[in-house]
C-alpha cells in the first residue's frame, strides 16, 4: 500500500509521524506532495484547513483517490462536517482504512463557474445572448458574496494565530457597520433565463455544500454534502444594529426564521449583480460576479470516521 501526504501552511512532514506509528505497517510506502496519476498511490492524507483543501480540489477530483482530511488549519469547517474534530479522529480513520479500506464515501462538491460576457456585448464568434462558462472552480464548504466575502478578504490579512482564535468574528463586527447593501439577482436552476428569485438589496448570499463557515458559523444548518443540492442563504438589507444581534444566532443555526433572511435549496443558481463583486469560497478568493454556482455529485472520495 502506498500513500501521499500534502501539507498546508504551518504543517510539515513531522506531523506525519503519528500516522506512521499508528499503522505500524512497514509495507506502507509514503511520498510527500501530490501524486501523479497511475503511480500506485492508494490514498492521500491532506494536513490543513479549508483553504488548503480548496487549493487542491481540482487535482484531487481528477485523481479520484480516497482523501483523509487532517484538521490542521484555522477554521477546519470541512473537517468538522465530515466528522473529524481532532487529529486523533483522523488517526483512527486512517487505522481503519489501512486495515480494510473501509469508511470511504464519495461526496458532493460545490462548483463555481464565472460567466463571460453575461449581460454584455457578445464576442465576435458568439450569438447575441449567449453565455460562456469560464473555468470551473470547486469548493468543499461554503461560497459567499457580499458581507461574508469582504470579511474573508480582511480575515486573510490577519496573523494565522489570530485567525484561528476568533479572527473571523473580530473582523465581522466592524465590517457590519460599514458594509452597504447591494442589488443582487439570484435565479434557480429551473428559472435560469426566466423568473427572478431575489432582486432586493442584499448584504450577503451564501451557497453551502456543508453547514458552517468562518470557524463554526452555521450559515446553512440544513446543508448536506451528499444530497445534490446547494443550500442558499440570503440576508437582505437589515439594519446594522439588528444584524449585529443576528450574527450570534448563526453559530446555532437559529437565524432562518428572522425576517429578511431567505433560505432555499437548488442544484444550481445564477448570481448577477449590477457591479462585479468578489466571490469567496472556503475562505479563498475565486472570481467576481456574475457566476453560476452548482453541485457536482459524488465528486470527491473521502475517508469518514
Task: Go through each PLM region and give its residues.
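Catalytic core of DAGKc-family lipid kinases
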Residues: 3-5, 9-19, 62-66, 72-203
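Short acidic low-complexity segments
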Residues: 30-40
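Glycine-rich beta-strand-to-loop/alpha-helix junction loops that act as flexible
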Residues: 47-49, 70-73
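Short Gly/Thr/Asp-enriched flexible loops that form oxyanion-binding sites at enzyme active sites
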Residues: 52-63
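ATP/nucleoside-binding phosphotransfer catalytic cores, i.e., glycine-rich phosphate-binding loops
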Residues: 188-194, 199, 224-225, 230, ...
